[in-house]
From Swiss-Prot:
The gene is lcsD. This is Acyl-CoA ligase lcsD. ATP binds at A107, V108, G109, A110, S111, G112, I113, S114, K115, D216, R235, K331. Substrate binds at T137. Residues 133-195 are annotated as: SBD2. It comes from Purpureocillium lilacinum (Paecilomyces lilacinus).
């Protein structure tokens, strides 16, 4: 449940934070994100309008249509999600055919982006600075965002004014040192009231004293200027536990997306009797990737194995899909993929069981042998012997 106070608080937090480095002059920004999502609703539709900025609204993200809108209108600020940024970096020839010199800032939220993707984007738009942010519906939008005056690769920036933050370990104790991961817990006037008609979920997320458990594993690191930055490692619940060792899906995804044959990727855990869980990758092939699936599967496995420790290898498999399930804001729906993995595994188990049950035992001269199997029909000579 989001109150008017929550929404107003986050708008004021955004505008106050941006006033430390942004000109008072209104600017034109890109409105390609779905406004039904909290990120676009608060940042684009509310905070930008409150500042007096103009918003060029598009019905959805289509690469060339978006680039044309930027060129035609002289858009200065891009509000994006990572899949859009990746799409731009994967089409350098198309991007270079448009005049994007007006763009000075690309603000990216919803999930992380790799250093290599940022570098490629920087080569295509050298005058544009990328800043990353972090937020969630439960905070009515944004918690922190990068600052062009003090940036760090991979950082989600600094906490917005009005936020209090703590990191806690698995036992609920405070993490008090830099560069040490812990679950982020927050307190702010923008933190929501709770979940509608769901006291159980509300009590699970809300701690005593008005603190919200985000479920995100975070580190606090200091920049060379001495400012503290928020680094999101991964979702606590999405960490894959392989033989007691933790694997962050985002780490594998940020590496796999750099392969030229990969357009999109999501890594999830699949159960394993020996290891507990194993990483599995769902991949959308890039257009023009013509390798046979088996060949590409082997190549991608080796691509990971050459970079990561043994427990991070894709021993759960690689599966190719036409598309990956995402929310309207572009965030990957891992729950849907996990359910698909469970359903597929159950279907394979039932198929094996059905095949086994299709083998009937009969006695022939005191010796048991198969009479019929689902896959193979026994010869008529064998049937005559019966």
């Amino acid at each position: 449940m989001i109150s008017h106070r929550n929404a107003i608080a986050n708008i004021m937090q955004i505008v106050t934070y941006e006033s430390t480095y942004q000109s008072d002059e209104p600017e034109l920004c890109l409105g390609v994100l779905p406004q039904s999502h909290i990120y676009s609703l608060v940042v684009v539709s509310q905070a930008s309008i409150w500042r007096g900025d103009g918003v060029v609204v598009l019905q959805g993200f289509e690469l060339e249509q978006t680039l044309l809108a930027i060129q035609t209108n002289g858009i200065k600020r891009l509000w994006l999600v990572p899949p859009m940024l990746v799409a731009i970096t994967k089409a350098p020839r198309i991007v270079e055919s448009y005049d994007l010199s007006s763009v000075s800032v690309a603000a990216v939220g919803a999930s992380g982006i790799s250093k290599d993707v940022m570098a490629t984007f920087g080569e295509l738009l050298p005058a544009c600075k990328i800043i990353q942010g972090y937020g969630m519906t439960e905070t009515t939008g944004v918690v922190c965002f990068g600052n062009v005056e003090d940036s760090m690769d991979g950082s989600c920036g600094h906490l917005y004014p009005g936020y209090e933050a703590r990191l806690i370990d698995g036992e609920g104790k405070d993490v008090e040192s830099h560069n040490t991961p812990g679950e982020l817990v927050l307190r702010s006037p923008s933190v929501v009231i709770g979940y509608y008609n769901d006291e159980s979920a509300t009590s699970e997320a809300m701690m005593d004293g008005g603190w919200l458990r985000t479920g995100d594993l975070v580190e606090i690191r200091q920049s060379e200027k001495g400012h503290e930055h928020v680094f999101v490692v991964d979702r606590v619940k999405e960490l894959i536990k392989v033989r007691g060792l933790q694997v962050a899906p985002a780490e594998l995804e940020s590496h796999l997306i750099l392969h030229p044959a990969v357009a999109e990727v999501a890594v999830i855990p699949v159960p394993d009797d020996r290891a507990g869980e194993l990483p599995k990758a769902y991949i959308v092939r890039a257009s023009g990737a013509e390798l046979d699936e088996q060949v590409l599967r082997k190549e991608l496995s080796q691509y990971v194995e050459g970079q990561f420790a043994r427990h991070k290898h894709l021993d759960g498999g690689i599966e190719f899909l036409d598309s990956l399930p995402k929310t309207a804001s572009g965030k990957m729906q891992r729950k849907t993929l996990k359910e698909k993995a469970r359903t597929d595994a159950e279907a394979r188990r039932q198929a094996r069981e059905k095949a086994a049950n299709g083998v009937h035992k009969v006695h022939v001269n005191g010796v048991k042998r198969p009479e019929k199997m689902e896959v193979f029909d026994l010869s008529s000579d064998d049937e005559d012997d019966d």
